[in-house]
C-alpha cells in the first residue's frame, strides 16, 4: 500500500515543530527540504517561533577553537563533557585546511559572531547550516575594537546588524547586513559606565545587555547598572536590577541568560560571602522587568566569584554551573566548574580541557537555529 502524499503546507507545518538539530540530519533525505532549511526565510522565521529550543553550551579552548559541552544535571551527581572541536575553515588562508583562530564569540539568534586576535575582519557563522559571512574592517580596524550582533525585534523582516565599539573613539559604527555597508552613529549617547564589551554582554530578543559600573563613583560607593542596547532604536537604555544590586559596595556581579527569554544575575555582597542568583520575568512581555530570587549561596573561601566569570542557571532544577576562578599564579593543567543547588553543596566538575583566557573558562549558551544571514554582495561559504 502506497502512503498518501501530504500537502506541502502540512509538511512544512509539521517540520516547523522539529528541533533544529534534527532538521540538519534530514537535509540529505530530500533536495526540497534541503533548500527549505537553508534558503527559505519564511520557513526559518516560522521554525524559530514554533520549534522547541535546544540549548547547547559552548566553550573556547586555548587552541582558539569552539567546543560543545554536554551537561547532565540529572541524578545525584552532575557531570559535564567537552565534545570535539567544531570546524570553521578560514577561506583566506593559503592552506585549504586552516582553521580560523577564534578568541571571542558572541551569540545571537543561533548565529555566532567570531573575532580573531589582531585580525582585521570578523565572521558571522551559523554552525547548524554552515553558512558564513566574512566582514572586512579595512582602515577602521584597531586592537581596541569589540563587536556585538542584533536585530530590530519589532520588525517582521529580521535584518541583522553588527555594532562596533572602540575604546579609543567615542563614535560607534553599525554594519548593515542587508546593504553590506557601515555607517557611523555619531549622535549616540554612551552611558557613563565601565562596560566589559568582551566578556559580559549577552543578546536576548535581538538586543544586547551588559552590567556596567558607574565611572563617576569611587570605592566604596560603587554601584552596578544593567545597560541595554536596542538595535531597533539604536540607543542605549537601562533595566532595573534586583535589590541586592542597588546597594553600595559589592564583591562580584555577573550576568547570564536563561534559555532565550530571561536574564539572570549573580551578585556577591562586599561585606559577606552570601551570593544570590536572581532571574527576570520574560523579556519583552511587559514594559517593566521584574526579578525573582532563585538561589542563595554561601561559597567557601576558595570558591571565588570574580567579575566576568561565566555561569549558567537551570531555573527549573535551581542549579547553577559557575566557573572556578583561577589565580594568576596557579598552574593547573585543566579548568574546573562548580555545580551548586539549593543544598548549597559545591560539586567540583573537571572541565577536561584548557580554555582561552588562562584564568577561568568561558561558557556561551548557544541555541541552534535556522537563522539566515543576509549575503548582499558578499562571499559566503557552507561547510558540510
UniProtKB/Swiss-Prot annotation:
Q: Does the keyword Transferase apply?
A: no
List, for all copies, the residue spans of the domain called F-box: 1-46
Give the UniProt keywords, A-Z.
Answer: Kelch repeat, Repeat
**Each Kelch repeat, start to end:** 156-202, 264-314, 352-384
Q: Which InterPro entries match?
A: F-box-assoc_dom_typ1, F-box-assoc_interact_dom, F-box-like_dom_sf, F-box_dom, Gal_Oxase/kelch_b-propeller, SCF_F-box_component
Q: Which NCBIfam families match?
A: F_box_assoc_1 (TIGR01640)
Q: What is this protein called?
A: F-box/kelch-repeat protein At3g44120
